[in-house]
Amino acid sequence: MMEGHILFFFLVVMVQFVTGVLANGLIVVVHAIDLIMWKKMAPLDLLLFCLATSRIILQLCILFAQLCLFSLVRHTLFEDNITFVFIINELSLWFATWLGVFYCAKIATIPHPLFLWLKMRISRLVPWLILGSVLYVIITTFIHSRETSAILKPIFISLFPKNATQVGTGHATLLSVLVLGLTLPLFIFTVAVLLLIYSLWNYSRQMRTMVGTREYSGHAHISAMLSILSFLILYLSHYMVAVLISTQVLYLGSRTFVFCLLVIGMYPSIHSIVLILGNPKLKRNAKMFIVHCKCCHCTRAWVTSRSPRLSDLPVPPTHPSANKTSCSEACIMPS
């Protein structure tokens, strides 16, 4: 029997899962339709498509892991595929990193030769960055596939108090390498986001000086900086939780562990919602989807209200000649 706070957090986790799948599913469907219609995909759309696809798979894996931890599914099923979950998680982080780099290169204005070179070529580099990330994660994971599984399984099993165990000292170095593999995209993403925030703040300050404080409000730049800052906070939170779980100091049922579950599910869902709100095309399609759902609900409610009740249906005649009545005549509704 689940405790009260665990049951509450489990319901919140399910809400996060549904929200994240809907948000990422919208991104995938919109860009897939564009690909079918136009036979091509812009670099930004390709990044968003890959990121949303990886996050849908990641959220399915997270939900399956949570079901295992809540003893709703056998945890041995998750242990056998934990290497695949690690690959999807790292791929999702790399795609989010390149998305931050793309925004930084396209929006920021930094007078440096290297940055100007990146600004001119980032669109052509996007497919190669995606392909390189996939190859890098797959190759590095499968080179150490046996050791990776030997480390990740005890970390997952240690969440159960009865099966608590520790990673052996022989695997401590490889565990550091795995954590370092998550640190590299974090470092690149942090640098890109900080450069972008600095560029937006510098541009806002220059505009305020040229136009004047009263005439320049800067709401667009402030909202952009807050949006980018939220990306960084969510990314850092996801990384810190991954490192905290790898230290094996948590166990199932603790409030800290349940909070970590919320943080893990929060990143791929809330980040995708912020991406939709900041992208005009995705935001427009999201509004159309909501309006369509409301129209379908209103139409269904109207049809239900107009449907005749059982008491309003015509009572079949009891005369023997009623058997000769056709089926079409018997089903006629009163006007």
UniProtKB/Swiss-Prot annotation:
Q: Where are the Extracellular topological domains?
A: 1-7, 65-81, 146-176, 246-256
Query: InterPro entries from the entry?
Result: TAS2R
Q: Which residues lie on this side of the membrane: Cytoplasmic?
A: 29-43, 103-124, 198-224, 278-335
Which residue ranges traverse the bilayer? 8-28, 44-64, 82-102, 125-145, 177-197, 225-245, 257-277
Q: In which tissues is it expressed?
A: Expressed in subsets of taste receptor cells of the tongue and palate epithelium and exclusively in gustducin-positive cells. Expressed in the duodenum, antrum and fundus (part of the stomach).
Establish whether keyword Secreted is in the entry.
no
- The protein's predominant localisation is membrane
Say yes or no: keyword Transmembrane present: yes
An example Gene Ontology CC term for this record:
membrane
What this chain does, per the entry, is described as: Gustducin-coupled receptor implicated in the perception of bitter compounds in the oral cavity and the gastrointestinal tract. Signals through PLCB2 and the calcium-regulated cation channel TRPM5.
Recorded protein name is Taste receptor type 2 member 119
In its UniProt entry, the species of origin is given as Rattus norvegicus
Lineage, uppermost ranks: Eukaryota, Metazoa, Chordata, Craniata, Vertebrata
